[in-house]
Amino acid sequence: MSMANKKNKINFLCSECGDDFPKWNGQCPSCKEWGTLSEFKVIGKKRISKNDYRAYKPLNDILKEKPGDRISTSIIEADRVLGGGLLPGSLLLLGGNPGVGKSTLALHICSGIQKPVLYISAEESEEQVAIRANRLNISSDNLHLSSENELEGIFNHIDRISPSLVIIDSIQTIINSDLDSLPGSPSQIRDCGQKFLETSK
């Protein structure tokens, strides 16, 4: 792929509303909060040659490949909500208040999938997740645990394992070191989410 990097630039990000600006202000021009702008580095965009654009396919050719074969979670209600199971290439956000059981549900889904699964738990160690899984009577040779919170490290795990499902618990704790901002900031969540989406496709 032939690409030429443009020069990186400095912007200022509001920690309240997530808007960014080319110049620093004491007050955010968007949400009017004071002292919320902090400096972050914007990585220059890459120029892509015409030969590097994504290919296209005729609809009938795609249908011949039988897309949409979903992966069952082995949980009837979860499969029903998901339209029959997990759709390969999709990115799903599991939301809810703290303590409602998001991580527990994610572990149960992982245990029911008969293919390699990668569970990234940046909030807990591998041992803590394993103890919780044992308490829930969850045991699986297909489930791989990691407490990695660096985006590049997560992608290295994905390359090695080639999992059919990746759980990120949670995206607020993941950091892309190319960005000069803290984990959980709007710029980090937006950038990491976009890269996870591109990878899932």
Predicted regions and their residues:
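Helix-to-beta-strand junctions that scaffold the AdoMet/dcAdoMet cofactor pocket
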Residues: K201
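Walker A/P-loop
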Residues: S103
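Detector for small/aliphatic-rich hydrophobic stretches
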Residues: S2-A4, N8-I10, D20-G95, P116
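Conserved inter-motif catalytic segment of the P-loop NTP-binding fold
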Residues: G89, N97-V100, H108-E198
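A sequence-composition feature that detects small, non-aromatic residues
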Residues: A4, A55, A78, A106, ...
